[in-house]
Amino acid sequence: MDENKKRALAAALGQIEKQFGKGAVMRMGDHERQAIPAISTGSLGLDIALGIGGLPKGRIVEIYGPESSGKTTLTLSTIAEAQKQGATCAFVDAEHALDPDYAAKLGVNVDDLLVSQPDTGEQALEITDMLVRSNAVDVIIVDSVAALVPKAEIEGEMGDQHVGLQARLMSQALRKITGNIQNANCLVIFINQIRMKIGVMFGNPETTTGANALKFYASVRLDIRRTGAVKESDEVIGSETRVKVVKNKVAPPFRQAEFQILYGKGIYRNGEIIDLGVQLGLLEKSGAWYSYQGSKIGQGKANAAKFLEDNPEVAAAVEKSIRDQLLAAPASARPAALADEPADADLDY
């Protein structure tokens, strides 16, 4: 850059700082780049698929899927992991369907969890914005976008037409809170439902509620689906779950993770540790026996998982090794099976 341009730029920067304050414009090279802080989802495979070890703080995340696919379970698991790190969490229950007992079974400290059950969509989003601006809340869950009913619709008659009200409400709210979320370094997760577009003959007829604003503002979008049942004998004790990262602004997108959700217990984390540990050679599998550092830990996956449950220090050591290997390596160097191979189907539990 020639001297005249340098002087002009310096004068412009000085004027901007004088008018808008120091730091309004800065060179990216003046400050050391820092890794994006993340909060674990409770699923080891999903944390790895997200590329940074979890969901990014200071960003908006959308989780959507069909009914009973595990959306709320995944968000409650995220809250439980955040609380373990000392985070303050809030749950804006627009659906009025939060079960404290189920949340407690997933590891959530319900005594410290902030809960709101707003009457209207405007109230829910205003509460969310105030919690964000407090700079004191680390994780906020909004369950769900479909339940954010505008006040005009609630006060109107059944059958009244309210075209685009919810879409305008979401667009206005997201414009307002996005900057505050970044400044507060707060993770805001919107749970969303799926609807079918009428008259679609070709392509995917599925869409999410709340129009397009959330799709643009979200840094991460997760599509969660139930792919099968987990059985013990003839009894169904859980569900096979697949999560696809359909949008990711902080790492490469379109990776996916498969894990199991056990009813009343949540994400089967030890099963994931065993699967990934075997793939990476951290655990040895010989026939039905699993071994760790030369010592047998169980015959069959269920017994190996029980060993990890009884010896959390071993589980933590294996998980740390998995994270160190997979999160430090570029995506091209990771085993392809981690993205595409389904969870071990033979009685995982």
UniProtKB/Swiss-Prot annotation:
* Domain of life the protein comes from: Bacteria
PROSITE patterns per record = RECA_1, RECA_2, RECA_3
Which Gene3D superfamilies does the annotation name?
P-loop containing nucleotide triphosphate hydrolases
Any one GO biological process: DNA repair
GO MF term (any one): single-stranded DNA binding
Q: Which GO terms describe its cellular component?
A: cytosol
List UniProt keywords, sorted A-Z: ATP-binding, Cytoplasm, DNA damage, DNA recombination, DNA repair, DNA-binding, Nucleotide-binding, SOS response
Entries under HAMAP family matching the protein: RecA
Q: What name does UniProt use for this protein?
A: Protein RecA
Q: Which organism is it from?
A: Azotobacter vinelandii
Q: Kindly list the organism's lineage.
A: Bacteria, Pseudomonadati, Pseudomonadota, Gammaproteobacteria, Pseudomonadales
